């Protein structure tokens, strides 16, 4: 089984954050290479935000991500590898 590292969680979270791009919902697939592993994250996610009012301006950072559905696949040269990806763990990096 492929063990998902904190670095891979960070990479997946960064790519998801970029794909959300200020929106309140994401549905799609993100494919990327991580080291010698090809990864594909497919999800439908509801994005909750918190409104922050500060002297330098307002912001609406992500306060929670609620997955409607998700899959995370990892592939090597030999084919697909089972992995221990956990959506809750990835949320810590968003």
Name what the model sees in each region.
Residues 30-38, 43-51, 76-78:
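Beta-strand elements of well-folded, non-transmembrane domains
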Residues 2-25, 29, 54-94:
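Acidic, low-complexity intrinsically disordered segments
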């Amino acid at each position: 089984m492929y063990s998902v590292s904190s670095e891979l969680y960070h990479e997946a979270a960064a790519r998801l954050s970029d794909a959300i791009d200020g929106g309140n919902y994401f549905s799609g697939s993100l494919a990327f290479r991580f080291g010698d592993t090809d990864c594909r994250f497919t999800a439908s996610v509801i994005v909750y935000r918190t409104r922050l009012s500060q002297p330098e301006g307002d912001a609406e950072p992500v306060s929670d991500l609620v997955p409607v559905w998700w899959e995370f696949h990892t592939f090597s040269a030999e084919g697909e590898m089972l992995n221990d990806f956990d959506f809750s763990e990835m949320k810590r990096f968003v």
